[in-house]
Swiss-Prot record:
It is an enzyme of class 7 (translocase). PROSITE patterns: COX1, COX1_CUB. The chain crosses the membrane at residues 12-40, 51-86, 95-117, 141-170, 183-212, 228-261, 270-286, 299-327, 336-357, 371-400, 407-433, 447-478. It is a multi-pass membrane protein. Belongs to the heme-copper respiratory oxidase family. This is Cytochrome c oxidase subunit 1.
Length: 513
């Protein structure tokens, strides 16, 4: 029974739960690695000593947080749980493929961990650029294992994307138009399209790298007429849509949370929100070379990528101001989920502003590969994606489990985390502006002060993570059951109660026009 339920599951709720648990577990591993990084950088001089090991830790931290924490939780966990409930579908379109998507991830994770434990590990950075990732600078099987890991994670995501697109287009009730689906459903569908279009390009790039390393091809080797810059184009054609894949489901969740705790029945500017997400998805594919301003692109190429990148700020701004307009005049409830959403809006906006700075190719020449870039993408990931995940988690926790979190502790957890991440990443802007480069395990004494502050911040975040584990335990131990949910008419995922029965919407739902 246990094996049938959890290993061979075809139920979207169970698979969503598996994704959430797997993502939480991977998140702990990724957090541990990030604390190793900050411990090394907490003072001048060496702690680990070996730069190769340091870079293996940095690389693994990135891969784990992206492919095994944010994506499984946002798309696999929240997506699986909520999308069928929100559109009134009995399950996903392909329930067994759904199960396969999940079970490809643990082997993928295992391969990634294996890549660090054999030979010297893959100390390439998450971008895996040749020639550093070639078979000379990285002899041994480490990089090959990392490539296979990416292949499995990529197949998992592509299958999941097919499943979500089919489900959302095909499994709505007959009367429901695409423009009546909730914004979270839209965000997952757009994310799925991005995955479907970008991951095959990554697969091509890393497969060419694999043959370069093992079969003596020269796709990325000038000695045989290849070009390492080709790899960068292939990687970033995936890599840039990927960062929007990481944040778009978060946008959807934030829209729901802000609407709910403002006491509104709908978000401000629904169609504008949909348009903005579609625009972001489209533009995300035509800006990839802004990651390559320092590789010698033509001046008019740089001009195009600078301006195209800045255009993305427009739909993003539409979303931010629509969230603020949703808040406006609302009956605001200061719940923990609302705090996460407000923190998201504020900090994501700051991350967006530093993104506008980096979009300028002339400025980026100076800031590329400094801690300014690290600060920028951690503001949008560590405080955008993660805050959205936390907000979604505390908002939908009663739906998933039937129990309620302790309100006061959940708020305390938010404030500890808020202080921790800001203390960790705000000083990194200063380090970057004064020229501290990324991916080095040591630095000149001049950079000591802000690195100390940053490392202290990381340990404050650690206490927040530990407190979160306790808060979840406390909720299960106290068993405070959900009495009633407000606004269920406009939030149909709550209609079946908390937690909903194993099978929901077995008869089609009828929607009043």
């Amino acid at each position: 029974m246990f094996i049938n339920r959890w290993l061979f599951s075809t139920n979207h709720k169970d698979i969503g739960t598996l994704y959430l648990l797997f993502g939480a577990w991977a998140g702990m591993v990724g957090t541990a690695l990030s604390l190793l990084i900050r411990a090394e950088l907490g003072q001048p001089g060496t702690l680990i000593g070996d730069d190769q090991i340091y870079n293996v830790i940095v690389t693994a931290h990135a891969f784990i947080m992206i492919f095994f924490m944010v994506m499984p939780i946002m798309i696999g966990g929240f997506g699986n749980w909520l999308v069928p409930l929100m559109i009134g579908a009995p399950d996903m379109a392909f329930p067994r493929m759904n199960n396969m998507s999940f079970w490809l991830l643990p082997p993928s994770f295992l391969l990634l961990l294996a890549s660090s434990t054999i030979e010297a590990g893959a100390g390439t950075g998450w971008t895996v650029y040749p020639p550093l990732a070639g078979n000379l600078a990285h002899a041994g099987a480490s990089v090959d294992l990392a490539i296979f890991s990416l292949h499995l994670a990529g197949i998992s995501s592509i299958l999941g994307a097919i499943n979500f697109i089919t489900t959302i287009i095909n499994m709505k009730p007959p009367a429901m138009s695409q423009y009546q689906t909730p914004l979270f459903v839209w965000s997952v569908m757009i994310t799925a399209v991005l995955l479907l279009l970008s991951l095959p390009v990554l697969a091509a790039g890393i497969t060419m790298l694999l043959t370069d390393r093992n079969l003596n091809t020269t796709f990325f080797d000038p000695a045989g007429g290849g070009d390492p810059i080709l790899y960068q184009h292939l990687f970033w054609f995936f890599g840039h849509p990927e960062v929007y894949i990481l944040i778009l489901p978060g946008f959807g969740m934030i829209s729901h949370i802000v609407t709910y705790y403002s006491g509104k029945k709908e978000p401000f500017g629904y169609m504008g929100m949909v348009w903005a997400m579609m625009s972001i998805g489209f533009l995300g594919f035509i800006v990839w070379a802004h990651h390559m301003f320092t590789v010698g692109l033509d001046v008019d190429t740089r001009a195009y990528f600078t301006s195209a990148t800045m255009i993305i700020a427009i739909p993003t701004g539409v979303k931010v101001f629509s969230w603020l307009a949703t808040l406006h005049g609302g009956n605001i409830k200061w719940s923990p989920a609302m705090l996460w959403a407000l923190g998201f809006i504020f900090l994501f906006t700051i991350g967006g502003l530093t993104g506008i700075v980096l979009a300028n190719s002339s400025l980026d020449i100076v800031l590329h590969d400094t801690y300014y870039v690290v600060a920028h993408f951690h503001y949008v990931l560590s405080m955008g994606a993660v805050f959205a995940i936390m907000g979604g988690f505390v908002h939908w926790f009663p739906l998933f489990t039937g129990y309620m979190l302790n309100d006061m502790w959940a708020k305390i957890h938010f404030f500890i985390m808020f202080v921790g991440v800001n203390l960790t990443f705000f000083p990194q802007h200063f380090l970057g502006l004064s020229g501290m480069p990324r991916r080095y395990s040591d630095y000149p004494d001049a950079y000591t002060m802000w690195n100390v502050v940053s490392s202290i911040g990381s340990f404050i975040s650690l206490t927040a993570v530990i407190l979160m584990v306790f808060i979840i335990w406390e909720a299960f131990a106290s068993k405070r059951e959900v009495l009633d949910v407000e606004l269920t008419t406009t939030n149909i995922e709550w209609l079946y109660g908390c937690p909903p029965p194993y099978h929901t919407f077995e008869q089609p739902v009828f929607i009043k026009a």
